[in-house]
């Protein structure tokens, strides 16, 4: 099943018991966060607050609060099925030469499908049913969530920021938080390495002093939203990838104030510009680390136009100590990463980003070890292969007999197969999440790799221990007589 807009996905979730309408008045100032946090931690449904205090625009929260709903957004029922998406991405990133004529013929449909998914431009789009300009523009009339007591101001969280640089043929879609600064101003918090910031940098170099056009889409269809957080190949637009997943082209329309193309079925569109000379202090805000972050200076986004659908829905979230919605999104997208990594490193058995590690700060990788030093090669490869892992501080590599998603197994491997000096890799002065205040310098810190694999000749001079395993015949016999022993139900092994 595919969804052309957010509303059809909401209907699908509600019909499947995955969305709850809240008619009781709830304040976007702190109350929504507390309710959404409790529901997410109990693995509850998406929430549609129909009567936000001080506003008549409904607020959608906790949309991707479980891996299952992330899968449902992509037309899947099981998060493990997201590996199909990873297989597709792996193919698009590095298609293998055909092994023969029949293989070449079999791959034609996939290439054809990928090439035939440019966005479809539509007229009279739903996102422009209502148009506000000049004095009508007032961001304070949106039910923007104020998430935590120490937050400096309300925060736009789920906006798809649409930019285009002079060096790129395609647009970039990115999700960057935006602090409410005034009726027509937001602070655009994008880090230097992110696509929007790079586009802006290139624009300033080519057009010094000029205003930079920017558009933010709120409440887009779920596939386009997820396309913006998926490792799409640089040569492919997020719109084309979303169309590929959906099975039909993404509908877009031209923005009113500039040439940028926006998702036509979005609930709300903010159009405007960034003046390269206008900066403002952003923060502090509670973030996915579970702490309030430091303040810093970022560009100001001036909104000149607000367009929206009739009876628009405001899509929002919060970030905090895991589990939060980004962490659950990370758990689901973990399955997308596995095939991509395996394509480059076939020896990888499994890959896990534990949500407790703030989605990406720690990774555990199980491998089919083939030679001394193999674990260290995999560490280096994971850090450098995808930009999503640039900020991963800790990588633990284990053997294929260890379940990398089970901390009992992982801790056992670390404590029995590692020597701290020999098996720990430390790398200094590497890119680190700017929000990681544990690093000695903002944006620059160290990484640690832990080789928790069995050691081969050349890695140790000692005889390596053999794991204790019970005889299978004995286990089978005990299974057969268990009910006669008068012991409670057999434990699950």
UniProtKB/Swiss-Prot annotation:
- Pathway entry: Cofactor biosynthesis; ubiquinone biosynthesis
Kindly state the subunit structure of this protein: Homohexamer.
This enzyme catalyses: a 4-hydroxy-3-(all-trans-polyprenyl)benzoate + H(+) = a 2-(all-trans-polyprenyl)phenol + CO2
**Which family, according to the similarity comment?**
Belongs to the UbiD family.
Task: Give Gene Ontology CC terms.
Answer: cytosol; plasma membrane
Q: How does it sit in the membrane?
A: Peripheral membrane protein
Q: Which organism is it from?
A: Shewanella piezotolerans (strain WP3 / JCM 13877)
Q: Which residues bind Mn(2+)?
A: 172, 238
Q: Does the keyword Glycoprotein apply?
A: no
Q: How is the cofactor bound here?
A: Binds 1 prenylated FMN per subunit.
- Give the EC number(s) listed in the UniProt record: 4.1.1.98
Q: Which UniProt keywords apply?
A: Cell membrane, Decarboxylase, Flavoprotein, FMN, Lyase, Manganese, Membrane, Metal-binding, Ubiquinone biosynthesis
GO terms, molecular function: 3-octaprenyl-4-hydroxybenzoate carboxy-lyase activity; metal ion binding
Which residues are named in the active-site annotation?
Answer: 287
Biological role: Catalyzes the decarboxylation of 3-octaprenyl-4-hydroxy benzoate to 2-octaprenylphenol, an intermediate step in ubiquinone biosynthesis.
Q: Which InterPro entries match?
A: UbiD, UbiD-like_C, UbiD-like_N, UbiD_bacteria, UbiD_Rift_dom
Cofactor(s) for this protein?
Answer: prenylated FMN; Mn(2+)
Pfam families hit by this protein: UbiD, UbiD_C, UbiD_N
Please identify the protein, giving its name as recorded. Answer: 3-octaprenyl-4-hydroxybenzoate carboxy-lyase
Q: Name one GO biological process term.
A: ubiquinone biosynthetic process
Q: Where in the cell is it found?
A: Cell membrane
Record-listed prenylated FMN binding positions: 175-177, 189-191, 194-195
């Amino acid at each position: 099943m595919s969804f052309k807009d957010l509303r059809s996905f909401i209907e699908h979730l509600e019909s499947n018991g995955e969305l709850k309408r809240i008619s009781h008045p709830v304040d976007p100032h702190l109350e929504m966060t507390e309710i959404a946090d409790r529901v997410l931690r109990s693995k509850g449904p998406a929430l549609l607050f129909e009567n936000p205090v001080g506003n008549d625009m409904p607020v959608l929260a906790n949309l991707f609060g479980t891996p299952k709903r992330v899968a449902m957004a992509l037309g899947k029922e099981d998060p493990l099925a997201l590996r199909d998406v990873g297989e597709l991405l792996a193919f698009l990133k590095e298609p293998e030469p055909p092994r023969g004529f029949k293989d070449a013929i079999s791959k034609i449909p996939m290439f054809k499908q990928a090439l035939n998914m440019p966005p479809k431009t539509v007229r009279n789009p739903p996102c422009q049913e209502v148009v506000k300009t000049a004095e009508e523009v007032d961001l304070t009339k949106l039910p923007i969530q104020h998430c935590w007591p120490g937050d400096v101001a309300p925060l736009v969280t789920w906006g798809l920021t649409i930019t285009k640089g002079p060096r790129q043929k395609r647009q970039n879609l990115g999700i960057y938080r935006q602090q409410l600064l005034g009726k027509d101003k937001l602070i655009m918090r994008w880090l230097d390495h992110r696509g929007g910031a790079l586009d802006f940098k290139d624009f300033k170099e080519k057009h010094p002093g000029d205003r930079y056009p920017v558009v933010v889409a709120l409440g887009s269809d779920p596939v386009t939203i997820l396309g913006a957080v998926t490792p799409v190949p640089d040569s492919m637009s997020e719109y084309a990838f979303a169309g590929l997943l959906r099975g039909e082209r993404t509908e877009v329309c031209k923005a009113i104030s500039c040439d940028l193309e926006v998702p036509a079925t979005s609930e709300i569109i903010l159009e405007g510009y960034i003046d390269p000379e206008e900066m403002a202090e952003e923060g502090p805000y509670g973030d996915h680390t579970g702490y309030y972050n430091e303040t810093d200076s970022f560009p100001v986004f001036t909104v000149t136009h607000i367009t929206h659908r009739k009876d628009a829905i405001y899509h929002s979230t919060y970030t905090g100590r895991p589990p939060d919605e980004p962490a659950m999104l990370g758990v689901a997208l973990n399955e997308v990463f596995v095939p991509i990594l395996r394509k480059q490193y076939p020896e990888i058995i499994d890959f896990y980003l534990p949500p407790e590690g703030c989605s990406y700060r720690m990774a555990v990788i199980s491998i089919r070890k083939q030679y001394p030093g193999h674990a260290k090669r995999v560490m280096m490869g994971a850090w450098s292969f995808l930009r999503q892992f640039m900020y991963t501080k800790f990588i633990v590599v284990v053997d294929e007999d260890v379940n990398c998603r089970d901390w009992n197994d992982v801790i056992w491997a670390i404590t029995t197969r590692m020597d701290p000096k020999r098996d720990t890799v430390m790398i200094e002065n590497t890119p680190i999440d700017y929000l990681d205040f544990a690093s000695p310098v903002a944006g620059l810190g160290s990484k640690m790799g832990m080789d928790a694999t069995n050691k081969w000749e050349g890695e140790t001079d000692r005889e390596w221990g053999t794991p204790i395993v019970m005889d299978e015949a004995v286990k089978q016999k005990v299974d057969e007589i268990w009910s006669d022993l008068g012991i409670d139900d057999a434990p699950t092994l």
